[in-house]
C-alpha cells in the first residue's frame, strides 16, 4: 500500500508541476518559470517511476541545486512581500510565485530525504499526502474565488 501511495503522490505532483509549467507560457517571465516548474516535474516523475532514483548522484545533485535556488528566491520574495503587501499574499502575483517555490522546495526536500527509505515511513507518507493535496485544493479555491482573480494581471486571467 505505502509504495503505491508514494508513487501516486509523486505522479500527482509531477502532473501538478507540469501543469504549473504549462500555464506559465503567457507570463512575462515565462522562460524562467517554465524551467523552475519543469525541473521538479521531471525529478518527481522519475521518483514516481522508480523511487530508488533518489539515491542517484545526478538526481541528488540536480535536486540539491534546485532546492537551494528555490529557497534563496523564496526568501527574497518573502522579504519583498513582507514589506509591500497589505492584503492576502495570494492576491499578489509574487505571493503566488512564493507559494509555488515553497511547494517545489518542500516536495523536493521530501523526495530527497526518501533516498534512505525510498517508500518512506508513515510520517513521510502523511506529509506527502498533505503536500500533494495542497496545490490542487489551492487551485480550486483560487479558481472559485472570483474576487481574488479580479485583481490579477491579464496574463494570469487568460490561462486555464
From Swiss-Prot:
Pfam families cross-referenced by the UniProt entry: TMEM220
Subcellular location per the Swiss-Prot or TrEMBL entry: Membrane
InterPro entries documented for this protein: TMEM220
Protein name in the entry: Transmembrane protein 220
Main localization, broad class: membrane
Species annotation: Homo sapiens
The keyword Lipid biosynthesis is annotated on this UniProt entry: no
Membrane protein topology class: Multi-pass membrane protein
Coiled-coil region(s): none
Recorded GO CC terms: membrane
Keyword vocabulary terms for this entry: Membrane, Transmembrane, Transmembrane helix
Lineage: Eukaryota, Metazoa, Chordata, Craniata, Vertebrata
Keyword Protein transport appears in the UniProt entry: no
Membrane-crossing segments per the record: 3-23, 30-50, 62-82, 100-120, 125-145
